[in-house]
Each structure stands twice: as structure tokens, then as C-alpha cells.
């Protein structure tokens, strides 16, 4: 369960179709005034294209909340398991346009 502002809780429901998740080793991020668009994709060695597997569109406010949650969770992960090594700058894992 997740806590909402004010202390109430919401139940997170994941359908069977989404339960296994989707693998991505690439992300492309674009934005305008009203929204951020994140395309998650898969790069296959030997191919010169990225297959987009999911597109997520978020408001700037929600994206900033996600950024905060990711930052907090990476810090917790690194406390428990050690520092995550950075990949090469401009590599396939994250790309901002």
C-alpha cells in the first residue's frame, strides 16, 4: 500500500498482464511545457535501432515526484548493496533529447 497526503492509503493493483514487467536498457526523454515523455526501449547487440517497449507520459509535477522517489530508492539500494557504477556518458541506458 502507498500512503497519500493526509495519511490515507491506496492499494496498488498490478494486472496479470503487467505482473512480469518489461525489460528496458534504454530510455529517451523529451518534454514540453506541459509534459515529459519517456520512451523505454530495448537495444539488441548487433542492431542499429531501439525497439520501444513502453511510453510513459507524465506531468512535470509527477515527474519531479518520481525523480525524488528514484533518488531516495537508489540511496537505500546503495546503502544496502554498495555503490552502483555509472555507465558511459551518452550511452544507451539514458538519453535526453
Q: How would you describe each model-predicted region?
A:
Residues 1-61, 65-97:
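N-terminal intrinsically disordered, cationic/polar leader segments
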Amino acid at each position: 500500500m502507498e500512503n497519500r497526503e493526509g495519511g490515507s492509503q491506496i492499494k496498488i493493483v498490478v494486472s496479470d498482464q503487467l505482473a512480469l514487467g518489461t525489460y528496458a536498457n534504454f530510455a529517451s526523454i523529451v518534454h514540453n511545457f506541459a509534459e515529459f515523455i519517456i520512451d523505454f526501449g530495448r537495444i539488441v547487440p548487433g542492431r542499429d535501432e531501439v525497439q520501444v517497449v513502453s511510453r510513459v507520459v507524465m506531468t512535470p509535477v509527477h515527474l519531479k515526484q518520481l525523480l525524488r522517489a528514484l533518488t531516495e530508492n537508489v540511496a537505500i539500494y546503495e546503502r544496502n548493496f554498495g555503490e552502483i557504477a555509472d555507465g558511459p556518458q551518452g550511452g544507451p541506458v539514458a538519453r535526453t533529447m
